[in-house]
Each structure stands twice: as C-alpha cells, then as structure tokens.
Design a protein with these regions (language model features):
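N-terminal, positively charged/glycine-rich alpha-helical extensions of SAM-dependent methyltransferases
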Residues: 1-17
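Feature marks short, surface-exposed loop/turn motifs that line or immediately flank catalytic pockets
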Residues: 14-15, 151-154, 203-206
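Conserved SAM-binding loop and adjacent beta-strand
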Residues: 18-37
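A C-terminal cap/extension of S-adenosyl-L-methionine-dependent methyltransferases
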Residues: 29, 90, 96, 165, ...
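Conserved SAM-binding loop
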Residues: 34-42, 47-155, 227-229
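Acceptor-substrate binding/catalytic loop of class I
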Residues: 147, 167-184
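Short, flexible, mixed-charge acidic loops at enzyme active sites
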Residues: 154-164
Length: 255
C-alpha cells in the first residue's frame, strides 16, 4: 500500500515559492544529497539521469545545472506541471513524465544514473520498483538513493517529533512500517544483480536564517541514510574499490 501523498498535489503550486516549511526542508536536503552523489558519479555532464519521484523538480534542476540530461518522473500530475513550468522559466530542458516507480515510463537500459530520493519509503511495491530500476539502467549504470531506516529512533524523530509534535511535515506523510532497514535494501538490490556500496547517514546539521534545518552527512544510519548500487557482472558486492559508470571511475563514499 502506498502512503497518502496528496500533500504533493495540494501544495504543488507552492513548490518553489518558499511558503511551506516542509518544502523548504526538501529543498535544503538537495545540497547534501547531491554532494554525496557527486562523489560517486564525478562529472554528470553528458549523462542521462532519471530523477525517480522528482516532485516539483528540486533535484532535477540541480542535476540539469550540472550538465546532465534529465528525465523526471512523478505520480503527481500537479507536481509535474509545476516542475515543467519552472524548468522552462529557468531555461532548463528537462523531460518530465507522469509515472510510478513500479512502472517507469522509460525505455529498457536507457539511463546512466537513477537518482531516487524521498521515495523508497513511500512506494506501494518496493520489489517492483527495484525490478524497474534494473530494467531501465544501462549495463554500466548506477542507482543513487536515500531512505529512512526502520528503527524506533527513526519513527520517533520522523513521525512523532517531525509530524506530530513540531509539525515540520504534514501528518500522515510517513508510515514507519514502510521504513527500510539497510540489510533489507542490500538483499533486494543484490537479488537483482546490483552490487551495493557502503551506506552513509544523513540528517540535520544546523539551522539557516529562517530557522529551518540544514542537512549533511552523519556517522549514524539509524534515521536516514544514502547509498548507491551498480550493475555487477561478476556478482560481487561493493568492497570499497572504485566501480565504473559510463567509462568513468566512481569513488565509493565510505566515510
């Protein structure tokens, strides 16, 4: 069962105007996520990148700014319309499509990288999503993601404090039963022939002038974590050595 994500339709028109605190928090998460992904990919220029669950386009535009050819997919028609309009106003040529992770509207083996943030803990069928990830990635492609760990601490911080007490997020955004342990994620990806690199913690590191959280890497993966996986023809898991994507060497992001 998929989470109730009607908030992304309700607030789509406010995606870029800074009026909604939870959207500002999503925007503030882009720099640390991208800083980590940069260490894996190196140069984005010339790569075809799928932003899976793109929402109103925060990550898509950041990737386009780095020179990637970006395809953004999201189930919210309202968010896609906002993303397309904003990209055009900024001069970005980003292809946006309405679609779900369980049935990605992208051709087989057509993308160099998939970026999937704030998504995996919401989808209806995680196994189907990973089947689709495997299908659309090129043989030397890389899957970059983040999600929320299924721990009591994550449920306390994200749901009880974040949604109920401090109301940083709309209530009902997250179902802690859908949070994903790193060990579970690793097993699912390996079943699909993907080697998995080390996981990296992600969380609040301070405040900005609007007293919104800013984010960065953390030593613990007990709440949120980032990771990457890639097609491994030899069936070997990540071991801390470099891996190849589109002819370039990727550096593992072990802390």
């Amino acid at each position: 069962m998929r989470n109730d994500l009607s908030i992304y339709r309700t607030y789509a028109a406010n995606w870029w105007d800074g009026s909604q605190r939870f959207l500002r928090l999503l925007h503030n998460l882009v720099p640390p996520r991208l800083a980590y992904f940069d260490t894996i990919v190196g140069s984005w220029r010339g790569k075809t990148v799928l932003d899976l669950g793109c929402g109103g386009g925060f990550m898509s535009e950041a990737l386009a700014r780095r020179g990637a050819t970006v395809v953004g997919v999201d189930p919210s028609e309202e968010a896609i319309r906002v993303a397309q309009a904003h990209a055009e106003s900024e001069g970005f040529k980003i292809e946006y499509e309405v679609g779900y992770g369980e049935s990605i509207p992208v051709a087989d083996h057509s993308v160099d990288c998939i970026v999937c943030v704030d998504v995996l803990e919401h989808v209806a069928d995680l196994d189907r999503v990973f089947d689709e990830v495997q299908r659309v990635l090129k043989p030397d492609g890389v899957f970059l993601f983040d999600t929320i760990n299924r721990t009591p601490l994550a449920a306390l911080v994200i749901v009880h404090l974040g949604e109920t007490i401090f109301r940083l997020l709309p209530r009902g955004t997250h179902d802690p039963r859908k949070f994903i342990r790193p060990s579970e994620l690793r097993v699912k990806l390996r079943k699909r022939g993907l080697a998995v690199g080390p996981f990296v913690g992600l969380g609040p590191r301070g405040f900005n002038r609007r007293f919104d959280f800013t984010f960065g890497r953390l030593p613990s993966v007990q709440i949120m974590y980032m990771g990457h996986a890639w097609a491994d023809p030899h069936g070997k898991a990540a071991s801390g050595s470099a891996v190849a994507v589109s002819g370039q060497r990727l550096r593992n992001a072990a802390m």
